[in-house]
């Protein structure tokens, strides 16, 4: 088994449980903003619409088709419209509240804290994330995992975003390690895995849903605890 000198991690959907935290936040806001009084038929419909719209916007962002500001301004405007809210003028206030409260949630993916406890004494750990600068740091602080990481690299700080090799090269420059001595762990085949591979970095694809794919990965896991046998 190859030995590594440093480990890079994605944050959302790999360590920080975005789906659970988003649902928790949206459930609170759905009630606070009285969305059923505004024409939404159910919270489940609202949540499913959000997930679809959010996935579409982040996919477009990752492909370089839109900027982060478009996500901020369009996400809940679209959700409101598609769930039957006639007056969408409150969507920006809803969005601002969501962005403020979401990062305060603390849910991590199963076994995330345990594997960080295991890896932290053995490797310098670094986060590499495309998320908003202010929200990503708040997520890490709220979840109580900041002390595990020597570096937290956001796309804003690096001046480039995954899957560009430049963000990985920036991260390696901060750590002082070479690409061949690093490994990237993430859940997204395009941004995390293909991006790291293009930078010459080995990859570990975190695939808890066991999705079928044809991508080339160095290793693949379905549970974070499997990292113990690889690192």
Task: Set out the residue ranges of the language-model regions.
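A short, structure-level motif marking secondary-structure boundaries and short turns
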Residues: 60-62, 100-101, 121, 152-154, ...
């Amino acid at each position: 088994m190859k030995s590594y000198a440093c480990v890079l991690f994605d944050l959302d959907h790999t360590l920080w449980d975005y789906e659970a935290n988003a649902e928790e936040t949206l459930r609170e806001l759905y009630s606070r903003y009285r969305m059923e009084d505004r024409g939404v038929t159910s919270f489940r419909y609202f949540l499913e619409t959000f997930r679809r719209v959010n996935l579409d916007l982040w996919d477009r962002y990752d492909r370089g088709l839109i900027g982060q500001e478009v996500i901020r301004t369009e996400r809940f405007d679209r959700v409101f419209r598609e769930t039957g809210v006639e007056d969408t003028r409150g969507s920006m206030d809803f969005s601002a509240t969501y962005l403020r409260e979401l990062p305060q949630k603390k849910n991590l993916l199963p076994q995330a804290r345990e594997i960080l406890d295991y890896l932290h004494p053995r490797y310098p750990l670094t986060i590499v994330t495309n998320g908003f600068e202010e929200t990503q740091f708040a997520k890490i602080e709220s979840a109580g995992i900041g002390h595990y990481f020597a570096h937290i690299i956001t796309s804003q700080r690096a001046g480039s975003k995954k899957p560009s090799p430049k963000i990985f090269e920036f991260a390696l420059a901060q750590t002082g390690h070479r690409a061949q001595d690093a490994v990237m762990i993430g859940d997204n085949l395009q941004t995390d895995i293909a991006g790291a591979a293009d930078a010459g970095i080995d990859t570990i694809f975190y695939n808890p849903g066991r999705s079928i794919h044809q991508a080339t990965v160095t290793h693949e896991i379905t549970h974070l605890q499997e990292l113990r046998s690889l690192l």
